Amino acid sequence: MIKTILPGKTIGIIGGGQLGRMLAMSAKEMGYKIAVLDPSDSCCAKVFSDVFIQAEFNDFESVEKLCSACDVITFEFENIDAASLEKLEKKYNIVQSAEVLRTTQHRYYEKEFARKLDIPTVDYIYVEEDTNVEITKPYLMKTVRFGYDGKGQKKITSTEEVEPHTLLEEFVKLDKEISVVAVKDKNEVIIVAVVENEHKNNILYRSKVPTTATKDQESLAIEYTKRILSNFDYYGVLTVEFFISEGKVIFNEIAPRVHNSGHITMQSATKSQFRAHIEAICGLKVGKIDNKETTLYNILGQDLEYFIDVYKNNGGYLHLYEKEPRQDRKIGHINFYGDVILGGKHD
């Protein structure tokens, strides 16, 4: 049974990036205190923390120090040591379980989990040590661990290119990509938003609500997401990404946390993914969430000046993360009501 953690208590966040920052902002608005652990003394969530611990994520003693100072613990990304988390969750209030981390940290385990729940996936080949795999068509080779924004993956066409500890995924004809942002509270699974996503250079650059998927496709994606959450010991926001290919809904991956596509809910939804997550991990009722037509653009370091001009000339809702601009680094996002197309290099 999940504990009820009321405002005035302390929430610990493992990770001080933009997701941790926006979680902290929502929690502070609700009256919670915040403790953050991150390796960087200049991480963008630090400014919203009451307690800050500078330490590596695999520093068990420091993570336990964070846990001991907090009433509930959450994390902003999944690249945390699951074995350490498993030890800590026996003693502290960690509601995004180590079991979920262990599954979602490994692409093969994740795909197998989906298949066991009768959720369609692309065809794939798991390569452990032996790379002598017959390749008769192109595959997308992905490292089984620690990949994001297209990192750790490449197209291969021959056996000689196969590397150990990878997952080879069959290419499918991609009609569109959608994500289901859901939250599990003490009573039920609530859909925060269903979002359509467009990528450039493997980085999310535009999202929109509602999607152009059919009602049946959205309903199926929602059903699959609820099936996943009902089979996990987990509370909080969890996002599932899907491909729509030739009319079929195909599982891609799970993010056991708040998600980049869910930033759109800061304007689109009656309750943002960040507030919904805080309510859920604190044992509170989230309630029904509705959305209206909204468009999100991610802001990368090289595009900051462009989006500042867009904001000056067109308005919108600008969210900057106080991160140093660098090439392809996410430093903010901007939301607009309606289906907005900026044109030029951004569309």
What is the predicted role of each segment?
Residues 1-100, 104-105:
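ATP-binding N-terminal substructure of ATP-dependent carboxylate-amine bond-forming enzymes
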Residues 7, 279-347:
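Peripheral (often C-terminal) accessory segments that flank ATP-dependent C-N-forming ligase machineries
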Residues 48-56, 91-95, 168, 315-319, ...:
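Active-site regions of enzymes building and remodeling cell-envelope glycoconjugates
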Residues 60-69, 131-135, 159-161:
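Short amphipathic alpha-helix with an adjacent loop that forms part of the alpha/beta core around
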Residues 96-159:
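A conserved helix-loop-beta module that forms one wall/lid of the active-site cleft
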Residues 127, 153-158, 181-185, 210-212, ...:
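Short beta-strand-to-turn element immediately C-terminal to the catalytic PLP-Schiff-base lysine
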Residues 167-213, 218-251, 255-263, 278-288, ...:
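Phosphate-binding core of ATP-grasp and ATP-grasp-like enzymes
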